[in-house]
Amino acid sequence: MMRRVAQMRAEKMIGMLFGMRKIISSVVAGLLCFGASISVPASAQADDLQAMLKKAGQENAGVDLMAGRTYVVAETLNVPTGVRYIRGHGAHLDVRTKGTSSELASAFALAKETSGIELSDFTLNMKNSSFSSGISGDHISNVTIRNVTMNDVNFRGVSILADHGDVSNVTVDRSTITMANENDGVVPIFVSTYRVKDDYTGKGAEVWERYVATGKTADPMFKNTDIKITDNTIDGGYYGIEFSGVTSSHITGNTIRNNTRNISMQDRSSNNTVENNQLRDSISSSVHIAYGSEHNDVKGNNIVTRRAYGQGILQAYQGSKNNTFSGNSVTTRDKHPSWLLYVGPDSGGTTFTGNTVDGTANRAFVGVESVWDGDSSLSHLNDAKDNPHSYMVQGESKKPSGETVRYAGGNGPLENITITGNTFTPRNKTLPVVYVGAEVSKAQNGRQEVRGDIKGINVSGNTVKGVKGNDYSELLVTHEGSLDKLGPATISFTDKSVVAQ
């Protein structure tokens, strides 16, 4: 009897084990079906990699490269939708793609409408590539690029494009991008939005030409939003990070060095935050905001440059309203920019507050101008041949093509500029701490006359370190320009005490 009971118990246990085995097998099979991994052998080259990416897309799977191995990439690797991840495990890719100016190449090109992929933990060596991006994607969402290294990039590192549809929720995090040079058009992280075509589309320097002729910027065709550029190290390139038509995005915690401009936000790049970045050795601006880019918040950045001889280190101009620069530390040494802080035409509502700024400028420590008109800027100067504080210092400036012009922007009054609560350490005894220039411009080339009154400007409560005559010439210099029967333009301050009383 006891033997029979024991036998029954054993049979019951065996049945339970078989049942559990079936359940476990079913779960594992389901997991493998959704998130299978395809391992790429060390011997694989471009054709093999492409085939495995295609298979991963079909199976909704990820791709694992082999740790410590090097793969040769001679042609663009097209990553289809459905690929869940590409994990490098420390692998290197020798990128030899050959694009052209009209047909760009990439090491990895994400398919349109890609969503839900992570690319991580590999190195792209791009010395032998041309007109290529390391990673590119157009009309993508929910994409993460993390812990990727790109070396000797001679065109683009990461390209995030809204050329054929909206872009949202793309992250570039803890990656290192080193460029081969700082040439115009060479950009480590390039985020751009296609613009509606008009009469200026396709012309050289179309953004500049459009704005100067019409005072307008082109409409973006798609949305490019929720981009997060965080904790990366970037060295070289014309811009370190370029936003064109990008909104509601973040550039945070990056170290960016050796660029013409460290960060550029143009073409209606609005409602973005630039925070806690280490910006080093720009030739021109460290943070540049232009062409209809509004409501951006630039705060808590640490900026040091020994190479700057271009425009303002922190600046907004050409229709870029209501931008705030606060709590930034700015230091210039050796070479000198035109200004350290600057606001230009059609950019009312600009605020500089709580910044600590130390260095030497070539025109003024802080500059505010309503209209870039050379003839107006030279008016009422007792026959002087230049206005040393103005953008149009000798009555002219150069357009991007290099051609000299005497008008370069400004379509009306400049209102509600705030420069308060900053700490300034100027180091040029021949220049003022603050220059404010209100200018006019005659009607010409189909453009109406412009009167650039400056209204409601507040320059007060700042701390200015140094001694007048030794470290700066005056606290405040103003200029109110006029031409024939036009003007003078006027300046109305709510407070012009400059320093804390």
Model-derived segments and spans:
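Bacterial N-terminal signal peptides that target proteins for export
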Residues: 6, 11-28
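C-terminal segment of classical bacterial N-terminal signal peptides
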Residues: 34-42
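Acidic Gly/Asp/Thr-rich repetitive segments characteristic of extracellular carbohydrate-active
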Residues: 42-64, 76-78
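Extracellular beta-strand-rich solenoid/capping regions of secreted or surface-exposed proteins
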Residues: 50, 54, 70-87, 94-120, ...
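Extracellular beta-strand solenoid repeats
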Residues: 64, 72, 78, 87, ...
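Short glycine/acidic-rich loop motifs that flank beta-strands on beta-rich extracellular proteins
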Residues: 73-76, 95-101, 127-134, 153-160, ...
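Right-handed parallel beta-helix
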Residues: 111-259
